[in-house]
Amino acid sequence: MILNKKNIHSKSVMLFCAGIVSLMPLHAIAYLQGEVRTNGGPNIFYAVLDHTTFPNNKAGELATVNFSLPDRYDGTVYCPNSRIYDRALTYFKATTDLPPVGNNFYQLNEYVDIKINFEIWGPNPLPTVPFSDIPNNRNNQQGCRVPSSPKPHISSGSSGQLTFRLRKPIINGVSLNGQSLAQMYAMVSHSGAPKTYGSEPISKLVITSGIITTKDKCIFNNGSPITFDFGNVGNTSDYLNGQNYKITRNIPIKCEGGSFTDPNSRIMFKVQTGSSGIASFDSNYLGTTGSVDRSNLGIVLRDKSGTIIPPNQYFSVGKLNNFNGNWEVSAAPIAKAGSKITEGEFSAHATLIAEFM
């Protein structure tokens, strides 16, 4: 959903910004005995996932994806206290910042949980995150001469398995762009020695793109963006009162898929805020953005009865015949009472979402 602009008449003001750069004292880095660090900082493994499908679209349903990334990276083993003699093992620890939900699953978003397994060459080849002190038995010739030794061609963290679990049925799919999953740490030690890991991971796993889909989908406005272009508007709250410049659209809705063959299926809709968020002065309105301050300007949405549709809250579009019909919605710019809005363009972005209830 795209809501645009246009010019609000007022004076423009040029701003000049200045800053001060200060020199901070340098601090020596203290490495732990046996700690492994990646040269140049943690290696980021970017996983691009194909479409992952839940054919039944039922809560608790599982889908498994294997990943194997070709990246290798170089690191350094630190031994500031004493030499680590050859035939030591490399041990790994992995953690995640996602909230736990039990049975080794973590909540990825409101629709999907995830279980993460990294592949390690050792007695436990596919440990589940989180884990600690898992040895890699592939290389038993690792050692370290004071104060450090190179550790080339590391691939740990590059392969494994992701298990997705539906929290609830979804419509149209869920995007996983930019999802940070887990991080891995390493250290070199002999089997009987204590294991301590540094604060910096050697690698991180991030999903750069991926879509989880089902056979159930709703198509809005025949697949085209819903756009409201207000043209030139006034610049005071007297003009920007949520009624002037109002635009009304009649949006076609078509829902199809296995779940929609059940006449008892109940769906609700939600206008989910995008980068412009909600209006700072009233959470019932969409926020706006622009090249100048837009904190006092919002967009109000109303249904055909004139009732306000607050963003990020579920609502009904009325009766749909076999889950097909139309949604009448109006949009209008609204300013904070008593405010004067600076000249320039403005826009708001949001997404219309359907969900089973």
From Swiss-Prot:
It comes from the Bacteria. GO terms for cellular component: pilus. One of its GO terms (biological process) is cell adhesion involved in single-species biofilm formation. Its main location: other. This is Putative minor fimbrial subunit PmfE. Pfam families: Fimbrial. Keywords: Fimbrium, Signal. Residues 1-28 form the signal peptide. The lineage of its organism: Bacteria, Pseudomonadati, Pseudomonadota, Gammaproteobacteria, Enterobacterales. It comes from Proteus mirabilis (strain HI4320). It is found in: Fimbrium. InterPro entries: Adhesion_dom_fimbrial, Adhesion_dom_fimbrial_sf, Adhesion_dom_sf, Bact_Fimbrial_Adh_Pro. SUPFAM superfamilies: Bacterial adhesins (SSF49401).
